[in-house]
């Protein structure tokens, strides 16, 4: 199946007003403006965007708003690394969208370079929160580090140093795993584009959890709040269900909100298209189907939350800090589900239906070959 060449203008992309998404609380961190500034500083320092138009598109994307909506417990001294990670993620996503095949993107080489930037760091005492590391906020007039690695790898390495130095080894391992899956998913998306293949629903859910970058984004909830969920609870059936369902809600809603833009650029790895193909229905019926799925996922999430509360209540030896970490993480996942919708409904990244990308520069990945 190929995507339609014309984009229907009458598609209803938002859920009905009584949808379960709107029953989740809307949140907003007070740090939005500072986050918007930091995002542009990261992009400027590492020269990650293609000139004034792309820089303006980055500004108009309002990534700071997305972070502010989805990380309501974000601590002031942790803004810069979070802003840096989202800058990296959106730029690399746009870069890969410009390649017709994984080979053209040099995917294997790129993945190894990015993962090399994510080496384990000693899990010592976290730096004092009232004394962030020197140079915590990048400055526009700073020169990027000199070396053989490409700018996106250099930027990720700096972001990772600031993130990992505050986190446990277990958190670092989980984040690195999720980042590897995120990078792996680019190859499958490129294969789909190359062969104009809309994926089957049977494998799409797992692919989309990885390609959407939502799993490392949820890991960052713990960094942002300065509270880590105990490792055993992370592996509980209840919390795994909550993470999976929150991830699915975010990426499937994103598929709906980005549909018009993805039809224009020829993207085929989209849940709405997968549903349309599998069920043999039109795009609007597929969108409605997706939102019914999202409502069911939220219901499963909330029932798992109740079960997790019971588990924590009977788990002898849990500290108050552990319970607070679980509560904050749960609250953050709800903020992500709602905040992604509210941000995506107005961000020019999706509202502006065009082919402008933040960067088309292959040197950011370390290669000059283009499709």
Task: Give short role names for the model-derived ranges.
Residues 1-371:
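Alpha-helical, largely C-terminal catalytic domains
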């Amino acid at each position: 199946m190929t995507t339609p060449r014309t984009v229907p203008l009458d598609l209803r992309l938002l859920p009905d007003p009584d949808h379960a998404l709107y029953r989740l609380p809307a949140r907003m961190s007070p740090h939005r403006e500072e986050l918007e500034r930091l995002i542009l500083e990261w992009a400027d320092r590492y020269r990650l965007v293609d000139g004034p138009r792309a820089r303006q598109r980055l500004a108009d994307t309002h990534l700071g708003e997305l972070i502010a909506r989805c990380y309501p417990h974000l601590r002031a001294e942790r803004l810069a690394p979070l802003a840096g990670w989202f800058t990296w993620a959106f730029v690399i996503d746009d870069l890969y969208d410009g390649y017709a095949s994984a080979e053209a993107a040099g995917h294997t080489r790129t993945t190894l370079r990015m993962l090399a930037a994510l080496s384990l760091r000693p899990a010592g005492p976290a730096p004092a929160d009232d004394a962030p590391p020197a140079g915590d906020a990048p400055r526009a007039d700073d020169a990027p580090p000199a070396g053989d690695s490409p700018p996106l790898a250099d930027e990720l390495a700096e972001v990772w140093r600031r993130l990992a130095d505050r986190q446990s080894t277990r958190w670092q391992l989980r984040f690195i795993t999720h980042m590897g899956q995120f990078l792996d998913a680019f190859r499958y998306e490129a294969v789909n584009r190359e062969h104009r293949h809309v994926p089957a629903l049977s494998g799409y859910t797992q692919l989309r959890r990885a390609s959407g970058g939502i799993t490392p984004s949820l890991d960052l909830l713990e960094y942002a709040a300065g509270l880590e969920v105990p490792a055993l609870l992370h592996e509980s059936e209840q919390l795994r269900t909550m993470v999976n369902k929150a991830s699915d809600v975010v990426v499937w809603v994103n598929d709906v909100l980005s549909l018009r833009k993805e039809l224009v650029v020829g993207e085929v790895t989209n849940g709405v298209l997968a549903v349309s193909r599998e069920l043999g229905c039109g795009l609007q019926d597929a969108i409605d189907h997706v939102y019914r799925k999202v409502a069911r996922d939220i219901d499963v999430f909330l029932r798992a939350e109740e079960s997790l509360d019971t588990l924590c209540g009977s788990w002898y030896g849990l500290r108050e800090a552990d319970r607070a970490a679980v509560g904050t993480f749960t609250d953050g996942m709800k903020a992500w589900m709602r905040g992604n919708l509210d941000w995506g409904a107005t961000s020019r990244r999706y509202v502006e239906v065009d082919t402008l990308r933040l960067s088309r520069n292959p040197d950011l990945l370390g290669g000059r070959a283009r499709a």
